[in-house]
Swiss-Prot record:
Organism: Homo sapiens
Protein name in UniProt: Pecanex-like protein 3
Compositional bias of kind Basic residues: 391-409
Chief place of localization: membrane
PANTHER family assigned: PECANEX (PTHR12372), PECANEX-LIKE PROTEIN 3 (PTHR12372:SF4)
């Protein structure tokens, strides 16, 4: 805690005061000195200039010029250095100790340099926060500081398990590279060979491993060579990968210890050259004869490379970094890089030894050469988790070879072989600064036992079992002089993040080498040790390495503490470790960005001892030891630390607080610490020192880790030993607090590193002239912020110069004296310094990590304030305006300007404290806020959703005001005749009302409008975008939005003209002048009365608790008493009244009030021309009229109070202050909005800190509560200021102390974050098959919130207009709560007939705190009978005293308890219980077989399959008598047709069971087919059924009695993972439709039929019933895997029923569930939350997590507080501040899409609708006259044909049999006979369009007698009572149809009537003017009602239906379900979704 406070003080508080400068002990001396000197110069230089030189503009110019030169120089050098790193041209310099021979250029190297590949795994993007704005991936040198490349994984509430993190693979934020090893130099080879133990006399020597690439033979390969190893530079796999392996998988690999074979790896390109025989282990005798290999032995751990590396800046993709060679090197032939970047690889100093290349993708590790007793080849089993290593494309690499003509410095071993680990495959890229060493070994790291090999195995196992170096003299036959193996090696790393799994990790070479076991696991290890030793007899080694104390340990610990426990980077001065010819020096990030941990000391590498004697001398010297670690994602185990001693009681559980219990943890700086509990609960905390363990075989007990860390020299006093400490990586997502860490006690032997190459980059000074620069990118990023482009650099230099000029200008003006001059210079310095090194994170930054926008905030604000000060001073001196008195205040006087100037001056001086408190937002937020406030309060605009929309909205308002201003000015400048209104003023009034109406109906977001314009003006662009969009599943939302906006524009075209004409007529009359003394008060009283009744009385009577006194609403909806809602909400009379009164209020009363005020004010101005300024008055009248009218149209609930206060204040209280009613009303509207904000803030504060209900979330809350009392006065002042500036008041760390935050717009979150669903459309195939991405409940459940968003988009605006959510306004927040759905809905933009909102869905099963708050908002308080301390009860339907008091002290209230919304009911059944016994599995298999037969018979390709030669030939043996498929997966217990006699599946046994079903299915085909038992059809069915069952058995791994494998296989087949492994089944590949269209849907349908079996076991015994059931399910039910994009499309298209098999992988459960969804109407509780509560809590979370860096997942600010819903609100923040499972994009709902509201007012009015209505009226009159003349004629023949006209709005397909609706429209045709055909109720009265109960799941049995009664259609009956079986045509539109009229009654001239042959009725285009949609038609459900036998013959949907002019609401509700999924017409149906 203390260190975190110090870090916040240093990096947060002090840096905010200085503009970004602070002393960072973790950075280098040069970095800190540079920062300090730059900051001092920026501070002192202007101060000295002002104090020493006389004030003049020349001095200011010199000052600006100096600043510009300095900034230009710094930024140019910074930019050029980054460009230098991007190009990556390296100058290789040899150490002076190396021989001249090494300096000679390589000759004859025919292989050009190749770029070593980097294999990466890209994991899930944790959040959309951009990564740190650096580009460390360009650095050739940066490999260990992986955390700088990774994004800051922000704390997302509860810590996420690392398994979950790995499982949820996403975009490209986290990159873990698993390749990139160093090459060996010759000296290293010698040392390595020298260290190799000689083969014991009894052992047969194995040959060396020659190069396996036949095209590139190794010159050193030969028989009898002991071995020459590959690379020693392998880093263990990232613990992120290791943590993903389960404990069981880890333990399963313990058995793979026996093989001790050297490994030969072949690359992918060699394998292609060699063909199939390429992957062959070499014979032990070196003969080259291939050794047989078992299946699976060539599995590679790493499957591919991502050739693109992540940049920290905007994730750009960069090319590889290229290396340069010394002069005289070979020419880079064949380089695939850009010519300027082409470089040569320096030649290896060792002749003839090809160097080791990087680990490639598709590299196969093959065992070659086992120890004498173990001859079996190695079997590699890859766990499923390793599928996260995904293959991808690559770039061609740089080839590199050592020149063959070079001579070694020392003679090699005679006949010495060489194992070449060379990859020549095309397509590799060196990813600088981002490569983790691959782990090619069985990991020694705890809990990371993957099947990945290490080249150590080949290094140590060639020619025989690899032996460790025993103590001196222990080895036999040391004939070779000892050589030192080159390269520092690594020790096993500590436990990875999942430290639960205690597993024994083993050496990849076999069991002869034992790694030191984990502490606490010795019992498990010893048992394994015996096994390992038995498997490796030739090696006699101790089972566990001995421990040796490190004598110099205190010095190491002291150095750690001196470095602040996390060291800085040592300077790279002196010798470097020479590891290979490809130098990848580690660049240490010397600065840690916002929210990250500080950088530890550089890892300083050395080489191990060259001999055993040296090793012993090294131990005797007691040099400091350190541990090497992989620089991977391991937060929990980033340091190898010891346990403090043998007698320490280490806590095994998190809650062990007994005396002496030691807990290990990592502080915020990544330092591992221990906390020991003492007496009485006390304790003490210590940093854990570095202790290690020396092993007897230290030379071999290290991992290769040569280039994973930065190397730097150490003083000679340390004996040349180098120290290692990796950088800890911030990864809050791991559960590191809950598990005790397993820390092995190990020590690495270090020896003095040999001389190594020194690296420099080419820095081009001039074209052709360059100099060498030794620097690193990460050090540069720690020194200066990176600016990307040239323009950005120019802008930064210009801005710094402007700051200097304006600041010095104010100094010259003499605004500052004494100490304030120095303070002002401090402000100047902070603004300029932030352009070089900004504060990260800033107090106003909305995001973790580096926020580049915030760097420009200070200088921009400074320039604005300086210009404002200068301008105000100039205005005060010049006084260009005459003083104006307004409401008693004198404006534009000299004192006014000077006062404003002084305020701005003081504010500028307070800049350091302003930015420390975060009172100013970042620049783009401030711009959006200012524009939105001006537009809303000045012009009556709606809220903005982005800076672009704010600019567009304000520009639109200014354009309208400019247009109106001319008319107004012209009207009032001319004299008015007595008692007359000029025509120009009437024109102004008409235009004002019409434009206000139009602007109120338009959204501030111009995206949809621009899309419409583009489609008209640039149709080719639209077509191009449509073609791009067709690649993905179609989303109907954009088309619906365009259609809705088009309707609004068409309607406004008519309505604006009508409104303008009517307003002109009313204004031109003298009514406002003649009645001005009386009319005004009449209008005010009428507006007040209507407003009070509409917006206060009605909402209170409809609330759940009216006035918090009554326990039930007075006006209840029809659904209030229903336990379960059965249909759409009925429109009640009070809802109609509410909507009607609102229309009267909006369109009659308030326009009349404004017109009256305008006319009276204009008349007054004209009457007193000397008193008023015409120009100002015209401007005020225009702006005020526009604002008031738009506000009245958009948000009428707030207008009546504003009007009442205006009348009371200026007519009765202060009439002398009145400036005319129009201006009074305008001012009061502005004042009232601020007063409402203040009222909401005070309510929130008082509710939150009320002592009787305070909920302390932490000890700090209890501590801060008393201190909030004296804070109250300041709190009230803050509340006033926050109300004035619309800033949130946020509780500090969730406590009772409130502070003001920075100003925010109504859309108060600044990041445009919304959820991206993970499914099969955005994940790779291999991850889908192996890891099932997105299988967590949150990702799968997010689709229901997405569907809820679409439902709200359809109905929200209409429901608000009907008053179902109570009163509302822009910025309001609501919570929708149901059984499992809990969502926060935020209304952003509220217009006239439109609402823009965002929905944030919370977890279904949230945290404990969330559950408590959900209970609070869902439980009723009616039963409370308490009154203080007693319980006297309460009156009927009245709340008790306690309940009434408690409800008043809440920040939320229930506005509706039964809000009905369409959604999905979710039922899940445990699949295990349904398949537990064999009988149930047999039923499933039987249905599986029958479903396959069904789909075979239904397939249109059946004839093709039966005639296919390949299929026929493959199935011919099946008909041979006695044939049986005896696969072991078939069993009598699960296969009904199992032939016990033949022990398998035979054709006769198959026919005995299924022939009847096959024949029935064939009989239902339209084309006859042979159905005999030996016919091709039966044979094909048999083959497919056998194949399907074998696929299930293969996926299940067996058909054993165990249920888990069976469910696993069933789920694999359900999601489409078919593994055809048997050669007998390969015939299916003749046509993949056999799998896609037969087997795959068969297994899914079988699951549905199996579900139905439980409800009615005997239902499907008859073939007809089964066939019809499958057909019905196929038609009405979507059965799909939840990861399939079709699942999402089906839900969003409102499919009635869906079924899926879900595999739930939680932390504690692994189960399979059958998910069934049924579309129905759900009941929600609508809770209105105080919007200031939401704004304040969100602002508090942002400040706490981002600026104060609180990473505690159980922090007090997210504990439950029922009075404020603290947990639910904070959980709904954007990730990573909160953890919603779904965040919708901003969605606009239009009133026209609400079917019930549309039925009330008849739909939109347009020119087409008017013309249509006129023509239909004429036709009706014409038919009426014709009927009168022709007696006996059928009057209704024409207008009843299919409903005609508007009643034919069905988008259903034509049916084979005429429906009752069809027959009703086609004369008197009788109903066709058939089952299930009872009379049907009329559809015209249905307002919701619910499908009939026939669509419910499970469906009723289809065959059988018809229903006894008509199927009721629920919904409001807005027209006439339904008639049985006849579509009544007596509604307002019924007899106006023009059936059959070309171009009118039908679309495109086709008849509108539905013909008896099943023609699809066409939708009508224009609508009736008055009540064209009063019928509120639902979709025609004739398809659902058709006979089941005909269901399979139903054709597709008519594709022309979407093109019809049907309005959205005309469809009643969402469309009918998707038809057969193969139908191409299923997708156009989605366009009718809304």
């Amino acid at each position: 805690m203390g260190s975190q406070v110090l870090q916040i003080l240093r990096q947060g508080v002090w840096a905010s005061l200085t503009g970004g400068w602070f002393f960072d002990p973790h950075q280098s001396t040069f970095s800190n000195c540079f920062h300090l000197y730059v900051w001092i110069f920026l501070l002192i230089f202007p101060f000295l200039l002002y104090m020493v030189l006389p004030p003049s503009l020349m001095v200011a110019g010199v000052y600006c010029l100096v600043v510009a030169v300095i900034f230009a120089t710094i930024k140019t050098v910074n930019y050029r250095l980054h460009a230098m790193f991007d190009q990556g041209e390296i100058v290789e310099k040899r150490s002076s100790t190396m021989g001249e021979l090494e300096e000679e250029p390589a000759q004859g190297d025919s292989n050009p340099p190749r770029d070593p590949g980097v294999e990466m795994t890209v994991f899930r993007k944790v959040s959309s926060t951009p990564p740190v704005r650096c580009s460390s991936q360009h650095s050739v040198f940066g490999f260990n500081q992986v955390s700088e490349l990774l994004p800051r994984m922000e704390d997302s509430g509860p810590l996420r398990d690392i398994k979950e993190l790995v499982r949820e693979q996403g975009s490209n934020n986290v990159i873990v590279t698993s390749a990139d090893r160093e090459m060996l130099k010759l000296s290293s080879q010698e040392k390595l060979i020298g260290d190799l133990p000689q083969t014991p006399p009894g052992a047969v020597p194995d040959p060396s491993l020659a190069s396996t690439d036949s095209s590139e033979p190794s010159p050193l390969a030969g028989d009898g060579a002991p071995w020459s190893g590959s690379s020693m530079a392998d880093t263990p796999m990232s613990p992120l990968l290791k943590g993903s392996l389960s404990q069981e998988l880890s333990k399963s690999f313990l058995t793979l210890t026996q093989p001790d074979r050297a490994l030969v790896r072949t690359s992918s390109r060699r394998e292609q050259r060699r063909g199939a025989g390429g992957y062959q282990p070499l014979d032990r005798r070196g003969s080259g004869e291939p050794t047989p290999q078992k299946a699976g032995s060539s599995d590679s751990c790493f499957s591919g490379t991502d050739r693109e590396t992540l940049s920290s800046f905007k994730s750009e993709k960069t090319n590889s970094t290229h290396l340069d060679s010394p002069p005289g090197g070979p020419a880079p032939e064949g380089s695939d890089t850009d010519p300027p970047s082409e470089a040569e690889l320096p030649a290896s100093p060792d002749a003839g030894v090809p160097s080791d290349d990087t680990l490639r993708s598709f590299d196969t590790v093959i065992g070659a050469g086992t120890p004498p007793g173990l001859a079996e080849p190695l079997l590699v089993v890859r766990p499923k988790d390793l599928a996260l290593l995904r293959p991808s494309k690559r770039q061609p690499p740089l080839r590199r070879h050592s020149p063959p003509g070079r001579a070694p410095r020392r003679p090699l071993l005679e006949g010495g072989g060489f194992f070449e680990d060379e990859d020549t495959s095309e397509g590799s890229e060196l990813s600088p600064a981002s490569s983790l060493r691959s782990q090619r070994r069985y990991s020694t790291d705890s809990s990371s036992s993957t099947s990945c090999y290490s080249p150590e195995s080949s290094r140590g196992a060639a020619g025989g079992p690899r032996k460790r170096r025993a103590p001196h003299g222990a080895e036999e036959g040391t004939a070779v002089p000892p050589k030192r193996p080159y390269g520092t090696q690594r020790t096993p790393s500590t436990a990875s993040a999942k430290t639960h799994a205690r597993v024994l990790s083993m050496d990849g070479a076999g069991g002869d080498v034992l790694r030191p076991p984990l502490a606490g696991c010795k019992a498990e290890l010893e048992a394994q040790v015996g096994v390992e030793q038995a498997a490796s007899e030739p090696v006699v080694l101790p089972a566990e390495a001995r421990r040796g104390p490190a004598a110099n340990q205190p010095g190491w610990r002291g150095e750690l503490q001196e470095e602040g426990a996390v060291g800085g980077a040592a300077e790279e001065t002196g010798r470097r470790d020479r590891s290979s010819s490809v130098r990848r020096t580690q660049a240490i990030r010397r600065r840690h960005n916002a929210g990250s941990n500080p950088t530890p000391p550089a890892s300083v590498m050395g080489s191990p001892p060259s001999s055993l004697q040296e090793a012993q001398r090294g131990r005797a010297a007691s040099h400091s030891r350190a541990l090497t670690l992989p620089s991977a994602l391991h937060f929990a185990s980033s340091l190898l630390l010891t346990r403090a001693g043998a007698n320490v009681h280490e806590a095994c559980t998190f809650d062990d607080t007994s005396e002496g219990a030691v807990h290990y943890f990592y502080d915020e700086s990544g330092v591992r610490r221990s906390y020991t509990f003492g007496l009485a609960g006390g304790g003490y905390e210590n940093p854990v020192g570095q202790q290690g363990e020396q092993t007897a075989n230290g030379a071999w007990d290290r991992h290769s880790h040569s280039s994973s860390f930065h190397s730097a020299d150490v003083p000679e006093a340390t004996g040349g030993l180098n120290l290692l400490q990796p950088r800890p990586v911030v990864l809050q997502g791991m559960q590191v607090r809950r598990v005790p860490l397993e820390i092995p006690e190990e020590q690495t032997l270090m020896e003095e590193a040999p001389p190594r190459a020194q690296h420099s980059y080419k820095y081009w000074l001039l074209p052709g002239r360059w100099t060498s620069v030794r620097y690193e990118r990460l050090a540069l990023l720690a020194l200066l912020d990176r600016t990307r482009g040239v323009l950005e650099n120019i802008f930064g230099v210009g801005l710094s110069s402007l700051v200097a000029f304006l600041g010095y200008l104010l100094l010259l003006k003499g605004f500052f004296t004494d100490i304030w001059v120095f303070q002002f210079c401090l402000v100047i310095a902070s603004c300029q310094y932030s352009l070089l090194k900004s504060v990260q994170p800033d107090a106003a930054s909305p995001m973790h990590g580096h926020n580049w926008v915030i760097a420009y905030s200070r200088p921009v604000y400074f320039c604005i304030c300086c210009l404002l000060i200068w301008l105000l001073d100039a205005l005060g001196s010049a006084q260009p305006f005459p003083p104006v008195s307004l409401y008693g205040l004198t404006l534009f006087s000299a004192s006014f300007f000077f006062c404003a100037r002084d305020v701005a001056t003081v504010f500028t001086l307070c800049f350091p404290f302003v930015f420390l408190l975060g009172l100013l937002p970042q620049v783009n937020t401030c711009l959006m806020y200012l524009l939105e406030q001006i537009d809303m309060h000045g012009f009556g605009g709606t809220a903005a959703t982005s800076p672009l929309t704010a600019v567009f909205s304000l520009s639109r308002s200014l354009l309208a005001a400019a247009l109106l201003y001319g008319f107004c000015l012209g009207a009032i400048k001319t004299p008015w005749p007595e008692q007359h209104v000029p025509v120009l003023f009437s024109v102004f009034c008409g235009l004002l009302v019409a434009l206000s109406y139009h602007l109120s109906r338009q959204s501030s977001d111009p995206t949809v409008l621009w899309s419409l314009i583009r489609s008209k003006l640039f149709p080719e662009l639209e077509e191009r975008s449509l073609e791009t969009a067709r690649a993905e599943p179609p989303d109907p939302l954009p088309d619906k939005m365009r259609q809705s906006v088009r309707e609004v524009l068409h309607s406004d075209l008519v309505m604006c003209v009508v409104i303008a004409v009517l307003t002109f007529a009313i204004s031109a009359s003298t009514v406002f002048i003649a009645l001005k003394s009386v009319l005004g008060f009449v209008l005010y009283a009428l507006a007040g009365a209507v407003g009070f009744f509409t917006h206060y009385l009605l909402p209170q009577l409809r609330k759940q608790l009216p006035w918090f006194c009554l326990s039930q609403p007075v006006l209840k909806p029809l659904e209030y008493s229903q336990y379960e809602v059965r249909g759409a909400a009925q429109v009640m009379w009070f809802e109609k009244l509410y909507a009607g009164l609102q229309c009267v209020e909006k369109y009659l009363i308030y326009p009349a009030v404004v017109l009256n005020a305008l006319t009276v004010d204009a008349h007054t101005v004209v009457s007193h021309p000397d008193k008023y300024c015409f120009y100002c008055r015209a401007l005020l009248m225009t702006v005020a009229g526009l604002k008031l009218l738009r506000s009245a149209f958009c948000c009428p609930p707030q207008q009546y109070l504003t009007l009442a206060f205006t009348v009371l204040l200026f007519h009765f209280d202060y009439p002398r202050l009145s400036q005319g009613f129009l201006l009074d009303y305008f001012l009061m509207s502005l004042l009232c909005s601020k007063l409402w904000d203040l009222l909401y803030k005070l309510r929130f504060v008082l509710t939150y800190i009320a002592p009787w209900q305070i909920t302390w979330g932490s000890a700090f809350h209890a501590f801060a509560q008393p201190f909030a009392v004296p804070h109250s006065a300041m709190l009230f002042v803050q509340a006033l200021l926050s109300g004035l500036f619309s800033t949130p008041l946020n509780p500090l760390l969730g406590s009772a102390v409130f502070i003001m935050s920075y100003a925010r717009p109504l859309k108060f979150w600044e990041r445009d974050y919304n959820t991206k669903r993970v499914d099969h459309s955005n994940t790779r195939l291999v991850t889908q098959l192996d890891r099932n991405p997105g299988a967590d409940d949150n990702n799968l459940n997010s689709i229901f919130y997405e569907h809820l968003t679409r439902s709200l988009q359809h109905t929200l605006c209409g429901d608000l207009v009907l008053g179902r959510w109570g009163n509302y306004g822009p910025g309001d927040c609501f919570v929708l709560a149901s059984d499992y759905l809990n969502a926060l809905v935020h209304l952003i933009e509220v217009g006239n007939g439109l609402v823009t909102f965002q929905l944030r869905g919370l977890e279904f099963r949230g945290t404990y705190c969330q559950q408590r708050e959900v209970e609070a908002i869902t439980e009723g308080v009616e039963e409370d009978e308490g009154c203080c301390c007693c319980e006297p009860g309460h009156l009927p339907r009245v709340l008790s005293f306690n309940a009434a008091f408690g409800q008043r002290w809440l920040a939320w209230e229930v506005t509706a308890s039964k809000y009905v919304l369409e959604g999905y009911s979710i039922s899940d059944n445990n699949a295990a219980s349904m398949l537990q016994v064999f009988d149930l599995r047999k039923i499933l298999i039987t249905y599986y077989v029958k479903s396959i037969i069904y789909y075979v018979s239904r397939s249109p390709k059946l004839e093709v399959w039966l005639s296919h030669e390949g299929i026929t030939a493959a199935l011919r043996p099946v008909r041979v008598p006695g044939y049986a498929d005896s696969d072991p997966t078939f069993s009598l217990s699960v296969d009904e047709d199992y032939d016990l006699r033949l022990s398998g599946l035979s054709l006769p046994s198959f026919c005995a069971v299924h022939l009847e079903w096959i024949q029935y299915c064939a009989s239902r085909r339209s084309q006859p087919v042979d159905q005999d038992w030996n016919s091709p059809l039966v044979t094909l069915c048999f083959g497919l059924c056998v194949l399907g069952r074998r696929a299930l058995g293969t996926a299940s791994h067996s058909m054993s009695a165990s249920l888990e494998p069976f469910l696993y296989g069933l789920h694999a087949l359900f999601k489409g993972d078919f593994r055809i492994t048997s050669p007998r089944d390969e015939w299916v590949f003749a046509d993949m439709d056999l799998l896609h269209r037969v087997v795959a849907p068969g297994v899914r349908m079988a699951l549905k039929l199996h579900q139905d079996h439980f409800t009615s076991p005997d239902e499907y015994e008859e073939p007809a019933a089964l066939y019809d059931a499958i057909a019905a399910n196929e038609e009405r039910l979507v059965i799909s895997h939840e990861g399939d994009p079709a699942w999402r499309s089906a839900i969003l298209s409102n499919t009635p029923s869906l079924l899926a098999l879900r595999h739930v992988l939680d932390d504690a459960s692994d189960e399979y569930k059958i998910i069934m969804l049924n579309r129905r109407h759900l009941s929600f509780r609508v809770i209105k939350v105080n919007r200031e509560c939401v704004r304040g809590l969100w602002a508090g979370q942002q400040q706490e997590l981002v600026f104060l860096r609180n990473r505690n997942p159980e922090r007090g600010s997210i504990q439950n507080a029922k009075q404020a819903l603290r947990n639910m609100i904070n959980s709904s923040c954007d990730q990573p501040l909160g953890y919603p499972i779904y965040v919708s994009p901003l969605t606009t709902s239009l009133a026209g899409s609400h079917p019930q509201l549309r039925a009330l007012w008849g739909g939109p009015i347009s020119l087409g609708a008017i013309a249509h209505w006129l023509l239909r009226t004429w036709e009706r009159l014409h038919k009426g006259c014709g009927a009168g003349c022709n007696s006996g004629g059928n009057v209704d023949d024409s207008d009843c044909s299919g409903g005609g006209g508007l009643t034919s709005l069905s988008n259903n397909p034509p049916v084979a049999h005429p429906t009752p609706e069809n027959t009703a429209g086609n004369g008197d045709q009788p109903l066709p006979p058939g089952p299930g055909w009872g009379p049907r109720s009329s559809l015209s009265g249905s307002g919701d369009g619910r499908p009939p109960p026939l669509l419910q799941w499970p469906p009723p049995r289809l065959p059988g007698p018809p229903p006894a009664s008509p199927i009721p259609t629920e919904g409001p009956r807005t027209s006439r009572p339904p008639g049985p079986g006849l579509l009544s045509s007596e509604g307002p539109s019924g007899k106006w149809s023009l059936g059959g009229r070309k171009g009118l009654g039908g679309s495109d001239g086709e008849p509108a009537s539905g013909s008896p042959k099943g023609g699809t009725p066409k939708s009508q285009a224009p609508l009736d003017l008055s009540l064209s949609l009063s019928l509120s038609l639902s979709p025609d459900v004739s398809t659902e009602a058709s006979p089941p036998r005909a269901s399979q013959d139903i054709p597709c949907l008519d594709s022309s239906a979407p093109e019809s002019g049907t309005p959205m609401g005309a469809l009643g509700d969402w469309p009918a379900p998707i038809e057969e999924r193969e139908s191409p017409a299923a997708q156009p149906l989605l366009e009718h979704q809304y």
